[in-house]
A protein has these predicted regions:
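Phosphate/ribose-phosphate-bearing ligand recognition and processing surfaces
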Residues: 166-176
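Glycine-rich phosphate/diphosphate-binding loops that line cofactor/substrate pockets in enzymes
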Residues: 153-161
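Structural motif
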Residues: 26-28, 44-47, 67-70, 85-89, ...
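Short, structured patches in soluble enzyme cores that scaffold and shape functional sites
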Residues: 123-125, 143, 163-167
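Long, charged alpha-helical interface segments
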Residues: 15, 101-128, 132-138, 152, ...
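Residues that scaffold, gate, or flank divalent-cation-dependent active/transport sites
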Residues: 29-39, 54-66, 76-119, 123, ...
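N-terminal amphipathic/basic-hydrophobic helices that include classical n-h-c signal peptides
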Residues: 1-20
Length: 259
């Protein structure tokens, strides 16, 4: 297709100047891993978010000296690693799977036995998202725990960013979306990023509504109630407390390591 100079000028006249000159990168939000296929080819960086609790636990683990985490989507894969002698954790529906010693509580990874070790982990939602996104150019882990350091790092990369919310069993949830909205709000505030999807706009406004009191805002959210019923209140408070670490876990050759 050849466009003549006169035709190009006509096109330019019909478009706003900002549409022609806009060189900003995109930051968008995907609510669930089930929707990822609609976004995957447009973004160089994918931020996987599972606030309650997988990505929070992963950040806590690296903050406490773990060497690497191998995320796997199924309990069967985690069990195979355990049989080979690996420290292996498995969580389903908020509880530790029978036969495993730990799940996805961030406090589990603060024990001395984890320092310098390579650990295998499978969870209901977070490791599924990591598996879905594994072929992206760059995959990093996001949570409230590393919110500021991650947002600043993303701003420096000059790449399109997708926040992939893990949700709950392929359904929307509030806490992941609010965290994604916080990242989106920061990146847009730099002037280097823009977003056009309604999911991103919704995430940003949810964040702005919740930012002064995450715990209070999420008191009636489905997953917070689910974990509260399992007596995991301390986990909830910890996971909703921002900026407790400066680590950014990144996926390299199938393993999460510290950036």
């Amino acid at each position: 297709l050849i466009i003549k100079k006169e035709q190009l000028e006509m096109i330019k006249k019909r478009l706003p100047l900002t549409a022609i000159m806009d060189t900003r990168k995109h930051i968008e939000v995907c609510f669930t891993p089930g929707e990822y296929a609609y976004y995957k080819d447009e973004f160089e960086i994918v931020v996987v978010i599972d606030v309650l609790r997988a990505t929070s636990a992963i950040c806590a683990a690296f903050d406490n000296g773990i060497e690497a985490i191998i995320p796997v989507p199924t309990v069967e894969e985690a069990w195979e690693y355990k049989q080979k002698g690996y420290l292996a954790g498995a969580e389903r529906k908020g509880q530790i799977v029978e036969g495993f010693d730990f799940g996805n509580s961030p406090f589990s990874y603060m024990k001395e036995e984890f320092r310098g070790k390579e650990v295998v982990l499978t969870t209901t939602n977070g490791t599924k998202s990591l598996d879905v996104a594994k072929d992206a150019e760059i995959v990093v882990v996001g949570s409230f725990l590393n919110l500021d350091i991650l947002s600043k790092w993303l701003a420096e990369q000059n790449k399109n960013v997708l926040c992939l919310c893990s949700g709950w069993q392929d359904k929307f949830n509030l806490e992941d979306t609010i965290c994604a909205g916080a990242i989106s709000d920061y990146l847009i505030s730099t002037g280097q990023f823009t977003s056009v999807e309604d999911s991103s706009i919704a995430a940003k406004y949810l964040y702005l509504s919740a930012k002064d009191n995450y715990l209070g805002y999420l008191k009636s959210s489905s997953h917070r109630r689910r974990l509260k019923n399992l007596n995991l209140n301390e986990d909830i408070k910890y996971c909703l407390t921002p900026n407790q670490t400066d680590v950014i876990p990144i996926l390299k050759n199938g393993k999460l390591v510290k950036l």
